[in-house]
Amino acid sequence: MKLQLVAVGTKMPDWVQTGFTDYLRRFPKDMPFELLEIPAGKRGKNADIKRILEREGEQMLAAVGKGNRIVTLDIPGTRWETPHLAQQLERWKQDGRDVSLLIGGPEGLSPECKAAAEQSWSLSPLTLPHPLVRVLVAESLYRAWSITTNHPYHRE
């Protein structure tokens, strides 16, 4: 199984790159994790936000591998405690399909992305900055992996 993070935004601060890359490198070779960045639509005073969301959504879905399980990151999604995320990761592995996790831009995800998702994951009821979400997702998935393999990273 391969994990794929598809996220809107291409110019992240150095701390985001450093944090995300740190966790990315920790994943084992049998569970590759990749990041695909989708350019954010140009937002301005007179921007058509609905159209921008639609375009971003089209690009995100086009980046998802055929047959991949799509999981959106969205506030109204399911909140998993760490042990539950580890169980979810195991179920995804047993399913045998690659998993694409979608992070939208400032206005969130398009309705098409939400409709295409098999699952929706909420990190928090708080609105989080999208760059931070990349690091949180990578760390959370690495921690879940560490639980499933009895790696000492996670401590109760």
From Swiss-Prot:
The transmembrane residues are: none
Q: Where in the cell is it found?
A: Cytoplasm
Q: By its UniProt entry, which InterPro entries does this protein fall under?
A: Alpha/beta_knot_MTases, RlmH-like, tRNA_m1G_MTases_N
**For this protein, what is any one GO molecular function term?**
rRNA (pseudouridine-N3-)-methyltransferase activity
Catalyses which reaction? Answer: pseudouridine(1915) in 23S rRNA + S-adenosyl-L-methionine = N(3)-methylpseudouridine(1915) in 23S rRNA + S-adenosyl-L-homocysteine + H(+)
What does the subunit comment say?
A: Homodimer.
Q: Which family does it belong to?
A: Belongs to the RNA methyltransferase RlmH family.
Know the name of this protein? Ribosomal RNA large subunit methyltransferase H
Q: Which organism is it from?
A: Pectobacterium atrosepticum (strain SCRI 1043 / ATCC BAA-672)
